[in-house]
A protein has these predicted regions:
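Positively charged, low-complexity intrinsically disordered leader regions
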Residues: 2-16
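Short internal beta-strands
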Residues: 53-59, 135-138
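Anion (oxyanion) recognition and catalysis
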Residues: 47, 128, 169
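Glycine-rich loop at the start of a catalytic domain that most often binds anionic cofactors/ligands
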Residues: 65-75
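A glycine-rich helix N-cap at a beta->alpha junction
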Residues: 73-112, 116
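A charged, amphipathic interaction segment
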Residues: 101-162, 166
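Short, glycine-rich nucleotide/cofactor-binding loops
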Residues: 26-36, 65, 111-115
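Histidine-anchored nucleotide/phosphate-binding helix
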Residues: 37-50, 55
Length: 177
C-alpha cells in the first residue's frame, strides 16, 4: 500500500468543520502613527484571510480610539492632566521617529496620500468592516483619566487583562505593538 494514500473527502470535511478558526491578538500599546498603522495592516490582513482578530488597546494605544481633541473628565487633577496632555484621535498620532514637531508626520501623510495608502482612520474602518474586535483596557482608562464617552464608536468591549489573556491563550498569533 502506498504511503501517500488519498484522504477520504468526508473525513477531510469533518476535520475542517471541527477545526477552530485561526486567531490573532494584538496588544496596541504604542500611540505612534507608524506602529499603529503596522498593527492595523496586520489586523486587516489577518481578518481578510479569515482569521479572528482581537485588538487590545492599552496605555498610549488608547489615544488611537479616543475622539479627537484634548478633553478629560477625570475628577482629580493628575489624571485630568494626563487626559489634557494626551491628544486623542487616530488622525493626530505622531511618528515614533523623525516627528520634528509634526513636520515628519505631515510629510509621511503626504507620501501616503500620493501613494494612495490609507491612513490610520481608514485602516480602523477597514478593520471594523472585516470584523476585527476592539477591546479598551479598563485599568488603563481609569489610570489615565480617560472616560468611555471620550472614545470613538465601535469599541466592542471594555475589559481588563484577564479578558485579553483568555483571548491570547487560544490564539495562534499574539503580537505586542
Amino acid at each position: 500500500m502506498s504511503t501517500t494514500a488519498k484522504l477520504d473527502p468526508q473525513v477531510a470535511l469533518a476535520e475542517l468543520r471541527e477545526r477552530k478558526p485561526d486567531r490573532v491578538t494584538i496588544v496596541v500599546l504604542s500611540g505612534s502613527m507608524d506602529r499603529v498603522m503596522s498593527a492595523f495592516i496586520i489586523a486587516t490582513g489577518a481578518a481578510s484571510m479569515g482569521m479572528q482578530v482581537t485588538t487590545f488597546f492599552t496605555f498610549w494605544g488608547l489615544n488611537v480610539i479616543r475622539k479627537p481633541g484634548l478633553s478629560s473628565k477625570a475628577r482629580d487633577w493628575l489624571r485630568r492632566a494626563f487626559g489634557l496632555l494626551n491628544r486623542g484621535g487616530a488622525d493626530t498620532l505622531p511618528l515614533s521617529r523623525f516627528h520634528f514637531w509634526g513636520l515628519g508626520t505631515r510629510m509621511m501623510k503626504l507620501v501616503m496620500r500620493r501613494n494612495r495608502m490609507p491612513g490610520v482612520p481608514e485602516l480602523m474602518d477597514m478593520a471594523k468592516d472585516l470584523g476585527v474586535r476592539f477591546i479598551a483596557c479598563t485599568t488603563t482608562l481609569g489610570l489615565m483619566g480617560i472616560t468611555k464617552d471620550t472614545l470613538v464608536e465601535g469599541i466592542d468591549q471594555f475589559a481588563g487583562v484577564s479578558t485579553y489573556l483568555a483571548e491570547a491563550k487560544d490564539a495562534q498569533v499574539n503580537l505586542f505593538i
